[in-house]
């Protein structure tokens, strides 16, 4: 394979992995540990 193809595939895999991890952190099991500043604020 050519170098450009390998670089493109590597960057694409990295981007998909990062997006999947971000979605898992935002909506998956770790999201229960996140605090909501709007709920913490009292009027």
Curated annotation (Swiss-Prot):
The keyword Transmembrane helix applies. It is a single-pass membrane protein. One of its GO terms (cellular component) is chloroplast thylakoid membrane. Keywords: Chloroplast, Membrane, Plastid, Thylakoid, Transmembrane, Transmembrane helix. Its main location: plastid. GO terms for biological process: photosynthesis. It is found in: Plastid, Chloroplast thylakoid membrane. InterPro entries: PSII_PsbN. The chain crosses the membrane at residues 5-27. HAMAP family: PSII_PsbN. May play a role in photosystem I and II biogenesis. Belongs to the PsbN family. This is Protein PsbN. The gene is psbN.
